[in-house]
């Protein structure tokens, strides 16, 4: 176990005195209608939470955690789930809240939930009853906030959830292909809470309940607000002075008084003199009461280098131990972002997960099936956070790098509750995990380093020597869980971070022997160094070592088990040659991927910055700094995705065309080292038929007469125009030429 952390909160999450409404006790379900409020004896709600998801009273759903957390503080909390946003009526169905509206788009970003990576409309929604699409608007945070303001203009609105969290500064918006303002500015909300919201939510709720106006609540960690100038007592520094990662301060020598002098001369005895004892106030740390001024919205919108620079600074100010506040100008106002909240302790995590969740959807949904709930109803979340720092992932920016783990007893109690209370349980726990399967109880072994480090990843390019990689707590948890009465199997469905797992082969043996249901998913993401370096993912050497150990231990256990690798196509830094090499690797290892994913530029991710700017925010940014190749355009993104499914005949024409253009025609054929077969006679005939039926491309310069022609007429006219001027005329006799 690691040492006691130096990053400590000012007060415990559950140390606030309960609000007077605690006398009502916990509700069976948080009410979604006036009828339910009447049954509870409530005349009003203190807080109303508006969400784009169906209400499932389960700790895997953000609104359930926030609602039950506030309820435990004594507040009366109502839920408005997936309201009709066409008018304000649905937002008034629970009446006027006494304190504030809490607004979130849901567990997923509403745009990612609605559109694919190719900007195509999805036709399902896993967070909606019966998987029905279209029950939430695009940019749901903005729309819901506007309706709340229409319904009750004087009630504060506080934003939260992943959508608002990743849009707290000026950000690139993939769907409109432009830089948008902070969602706090666009929505005109009163406050934004980013990341996991328990600490700021509880503090703000109690301060509002004590009569403090929301306009004066400006010092809460994990919140963003609109200000006209910097907060009083804070000193600022321009971001252009900080475009380098912070350093870990050296740890003082415990016997510093006995160190030799620089010139190696003997130390003369010091003359002892009596001195008055004076009490010195503690020296402020360099990051306390300090803010970083980021380039303004107007500047980052017009200058991609400044955008990349601002993104780099933001990602280096995410350690709650040493992060400074951030300030970014939007017009004549500033978005002020306070430092991140202190992570929850194990005791606080246990208390959050011990709240009286029913672990089922609200009865109002009847027998409707909610796919997101079906996926997690027999799973247990054992930790939060991720120190992997993958460039394309937003978990680190949302939940933080410091792992927040529950105790063994808390997890075991939840497994027993599932066994005893959840309908349809068959004895199989579908997952014990979190953002990553094997980071439970892992954290920095040096409290001083943990407090001051600004590394983006604790495991890239190499595992930090301060990082604990002992998987014994996880192994002990697995063993205790599977020994419970009535538990037949404990599966691990969360992704395994294999570069950490190989540091402790005992974990791989435990996993392969007892906790894999035939297939284990891991995510190498790519095989080539170019894209891997931009993703901040380990090389294939770690994958090969993990596979060797996994296969060995599976064989020892007498089991036939396989690894299912996940890959990303079209990620910044990926050239066509890289994708061809990946496809060849897949074919060599006989992988035929069914589901593949093109890179999806989500707000705030480092990879999204690369996609938009063509610069690498993982290194120092400048106008002459490294340029990153970015595969853009529908055709190139389709090609990269097609190469992951090299075995699909529908992709062969596109792959052949690309291989020929790259000078790799030798990869087309029937030999074992070829990627795709040569076209058949029937394929060539079909291609010719399609070419005959194509219509010539029209531009604004095409004559109107040609534009109005039918394809057959246009083809005839085109063939006529291509003939010589004197075609069809009788040839003159040679003798007549000289006349």
From Swiss-Prot:
One of its GO terms (molecular function) is 4 iron, 4 sulfur cluster binding. Transmembrane segments: none annotated. Keywords: 4Fe-4S, Iron, Iron-sulfur, Metal-binding, S-adenosyl-L-methionine. Gene3D superfamilies: tm_1862 like domain (3.80.30.20). Pfam families: DUF3362 (PF11842), Radical_SAM (PF04055), Radical_SAM_N (PF08497). Coiled coil: none annotated. The keyword 4Fe-4S applies. Residues 704-724 have a biased composition (Polar residues). Its cofactor is [4Fe-4S] cluster. It comes from the Bacteria. Residues 729-739 have a biased composition (Basic residues). [4Fe-4S] cluster binds at residues 386, 390, 393. Binds 1 [4Fe-4S] cluster. The cluster is coordinated with 3 cysteines and an exchangeable S-adenosyl-L-methionine. Residues 686-739 are annotated as: Disordered. Residues 372-650 form the Radical SAM core domain. Belongs to the UPF0313 family. NCBIfam families: SAM_YgiQ. This is UPF0313 protein YgiQ. It comes from Escherichia coli O157:H7.
């Amino acid at each position: 176990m690691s040492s006691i952390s130096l990053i400590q909160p000012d007060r415990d999450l559950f140390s606030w005195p309960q609000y007077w409404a605690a006398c009502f006790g916990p509700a069976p379900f948080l009410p979604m209608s006036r009828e339910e409020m009447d049954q509870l004896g409530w005349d009003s709600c203190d807080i109303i939470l508006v969400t784009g998801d169906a209400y499932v009273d389960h700790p895997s759903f953000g609104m359930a955690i926030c609602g039950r957390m506030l309820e435990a503080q004594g507040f009366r909390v109502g839920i408005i789930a997936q309201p009709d946003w066409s008018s304000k009526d649905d937002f008034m169905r629970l009446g006027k809240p006494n304190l504030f509206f809490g607004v979130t788009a849901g567990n997923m970003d509403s745009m990612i939930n609605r559109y694919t990576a190719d900007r195509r409309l999805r036709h399902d929604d896993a967070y909606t009853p019966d998987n029905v699409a279209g029950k939430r608007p695009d940019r749901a945070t903005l729309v819901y906030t506007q309706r709340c303001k229409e319904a009750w203009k004087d009630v504060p609105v506080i934003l939260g959830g992943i959508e608002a969290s990743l849009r707290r500064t000026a950000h690139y918006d993939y769907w409109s292909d432009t830089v948008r303002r902070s969602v706090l500015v666009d929505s005109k909300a009163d406050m934004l809470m980013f990341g996991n919201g328990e600490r700021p939510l509880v503090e703000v709720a109690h301060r509002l309940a004590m009569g403090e106006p929301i306009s004066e609540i400006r010092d809460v960690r994990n919140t963003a607000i609109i200000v006209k100038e910097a907060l009083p007592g804070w000193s600022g520094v321009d971001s252009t002075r900080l475009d380098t990662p912070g350093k870990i301060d050296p740890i003082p020598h415990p016997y510093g008084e006995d160190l030799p002098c620089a010139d190696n001369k003997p130390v003369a005895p010091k003359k002892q003199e009596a001195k008055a004892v004076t009490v010195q106030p503690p020296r402020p740390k360099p990051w306390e009461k300090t803010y970083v001024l980021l380039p303004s919205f107007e500047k980052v919108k017009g200058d991609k280098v400044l955008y990349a620079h601002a993104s780099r600074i933001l990602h280096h100010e995410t350690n709650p131990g040493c992060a400074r506040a951030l300030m970014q100008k939007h017009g004549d106002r500033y978005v002020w972002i306070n430092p991140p909240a202190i992570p929850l302790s194990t005791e606080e995590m246990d208390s959050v997960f011990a709240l009286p969740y029913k672990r089922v959807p609200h009865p109002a949904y009847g027998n409707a099936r909610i796919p997101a709930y079906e996926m997690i109803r027999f799973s247990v979340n054992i930790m939060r956070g991720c120190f992997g720092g993958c460039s394309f992932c937003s978990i680190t920016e949302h939940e933080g790098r410091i792992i927040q783990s529950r105790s063994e007893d808390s997890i075991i109690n939840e497994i027993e509750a599932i066994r005893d209370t959840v309908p349809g349980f068959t004895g199989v726990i579908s997952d014990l995990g979190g953002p990553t399967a094997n980071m439970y109880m892992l954290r920095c072994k040096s409290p001083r380093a943990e407090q001051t480090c600004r590394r983006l990843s604790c495991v890239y390019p190499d595992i930090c020597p301060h990082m604990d990689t002992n998987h014994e707590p996880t192994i002990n948890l697995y063993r205790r869980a599977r020994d419970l009465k009535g538990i037949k199997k404990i599966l691990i469905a969360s992704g395994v971070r294999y570069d950490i797992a190989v540091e402790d082969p005992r974990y791989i043996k435990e996993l392969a022997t007892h906790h894999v249901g035939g297939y284990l998913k891991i995510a190498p993401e790519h095989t080539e160094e170019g894209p891997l370096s931009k993703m901040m993912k380990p090389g294939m050497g770690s994958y090969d070592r993990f596979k060797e150990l996994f296969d060995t231990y599976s064989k020892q256990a007498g089991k036939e088990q396989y690894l299912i690798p996940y890959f990303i196509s079209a990620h910044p830094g990926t050239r066509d040659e890289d994708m061809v090499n990946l496809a060849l690797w897949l074919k060599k290892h006989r992988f035929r991927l069914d589901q593949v994913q093109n890179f999806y530029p989500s707000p705030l991710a480092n990879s999204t910055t690369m996609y938009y700017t063509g610069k690498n925010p993982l290194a120092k940014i400048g106008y002459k700094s490294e340029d990153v190749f970015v595969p853009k355009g529908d055709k190139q993104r389709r090609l990269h995705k097609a190469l992951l499914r090299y075995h699909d005949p529908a992709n062969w024409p596109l792959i052949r065309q690309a291989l020929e253009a790259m000078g790799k025609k030798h990869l087309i054929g029937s030999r074992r080292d070829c990627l795709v077969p040569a076209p058949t006679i029937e394929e060539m005939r079909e291609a010719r038929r399609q070419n005959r039926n194509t219509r010539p491309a029209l531009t604004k310069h095409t004559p109107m007469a040609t534009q109005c022609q039918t394809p057959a007429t246009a083809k005839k006219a085109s063939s006529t125009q291509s003939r010589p001027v004197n075609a069809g005329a009788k040839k003159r006799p040679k003798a007549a030429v000289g006349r």
